[in-house]
Amino acid sequence: MGACDNDFIELHSRVTADVWLARPWQCLHRTRALGTTATLAPKTLKPFEAIPQYSRNKWLKMIQILREQGQENLHLEMHQAFQELGPIFRHSAGGAQIVSVMLPEDAEKLHQVESILPRRMHLEPWVAHRELRGLRRGVFLLNGAEWRFNRLKLNPNVLSPKAVQNFVPMVDEVARDFLEALKKKVRQNARGSLTMDVQQSLFNYTIEASNFALFGERLGLLGHDLNPGSLKFIHALHSMFKSTTQLLFLPRSLTRWTSTQVWKEHFDAWDVISEYANRCIWKVHQELRLGSSQTYSGIVAALITQGALPLDAIKANSMELTAGSVDTTAIPLVMTLFELARNPDVQQALRQETLAAEASIAANPQKAMSDLPLLRAALKETLRLYPVGGFLERILNSDLVLQNYHVPAGTLVLLYLYSMGRNPAVFPRPERYMPQRWLERKRSFQHLAFGFGVRQCLGRRLAEVEMLLLLHHMLKTFQVETLRQEDVQMAYRFVLMPSSSPVLTFRPIS
């Protein structure tokens, strides 16, 4: 891992206090706090070329990726680079210059200069599938005017308070069914408790809940006997994410020769997801034509009824919402349950809150969004420590000054959430799981797991509802326990996920 000349590291925003951290490293590391406030910036603006430069052995990296070791430690490598170089550095990739930052103040600056058409990089493996199959792209893969047109039509049906009010009862039904299925498994155990790796079960829950909210159809993923079609769909989602990771960091001109089987697996997986979305939309469309229901039956039905988007655009966005709402929701649930298991005092405080709010939420499940402030804070704390996305990205539409360096328009800027969340100048005692910190004061541009501005995550509210309602029902029903006290190591596999899922014990509350 390279470092720049010391002459370049005149970072006046750095706090020099040293702290000891036990996390997130595999052993103790002495780390510096990179602060958000410090001495005044120097008067002379520094040129882009003066930004500390990070160098990587690209050939070694390419060999690792080809051997399928991939970029699993990307978040740790970048975290170490910030420790060595300061809160901003640059590197080149494929001839393009990339600037990496990790402070809330820089996130705020990115937001301030954002236009109505914020740009992000294309996710090439996904785009390649759409182009080869002649399919439209959804908002995740679009930029420019087409992105804005789609997004403005989707927001009222996916992100608005009215949309949340509509799909909350559907998600609540699935969350209650998940708890009933879990209670049944516990009753079948002679010891009166259940010890398990819960990640796949939560993966199934998020698919079931998202599918119901999108298409108004249950898949039956919460029981023991899954139908072959559901199993095929689940396998396709896993395969799509795995192959995305394998293809993401290598040029297509190379992988078309070295990874032909991976490309085939990637396209085959997307074909299954595409066929599934086609079937669901066709059924919704036919049922609506035969007789429009007066009751809400999902996001897709609402979009079709309004006629604001053509069917192929609805399909494109449904595919992306389906794919993007699974791991990104299941993993924070896993890590929240793990942190509550090894922080029983926090778990008990959340249980008291959820029991106090039980009557209001039972009468109106949407109350979970307002009556569980500590649980919402716990989810923020989980996403601080374990941000699923790892980083946010923007292609600058105009010149910008970051950390007193000039960054020209057209530069790709990466904002590393993992490093922000572990920075003791931003979050005192960052190694501690402390949901209360989010209730003590306003934290501008510090909770960015769902992005910011007009390009924030489209499925944000759906994900929040799925997590809040499941944890609400879980906390009033089970004590969650674990023997494990050491940290769970995370791996970057397109999303940041546990390298091995923690084993948890669910014990009924008498």
Swiss-Prot record:
Keyword Ubl conjugation on entry: no
Membrane protein topology class: Peripheral membrane protein
Pathway connected to this protein: Steroid biosynthesis
GO cellular component: dendrite; mitochondrial inner membrane; mitochondrion
InterPro entries, per the entry: CYP11_CYP27_families (IPR050479), Cyt_P450 (IPR001128), Cyt_P450_CS (IPR017972), Cyt_P450_mitochondrial (IPR002399), Cyt_P450_sf (IPR036396)
Class in the EC hierarchy, top level: oxidoreductase
Main subcellular location: mitochondrion
Binding site for 21-hydroxyprogesterone: F391
Cofactor (UniProt): heme
Keywords from the named record: Heme, Iron, Membrane, Metal-binding, Mitochondrion, Mitochondrion inner membrane, Monooxygenase, Oxidoreductase, Steroidogenesis, Transit peptide
Family to which the UniProt record says this protein belongs: Belongs to the cytochrome P450 family.
The protein's name: Cytochrome P450 11B2, mitochondrial
Protein's organism: Rattus norvegicus
Organism placement in taxonomy: Eukaryota, Metazoa, Chordata, Craniata, Vertebrata
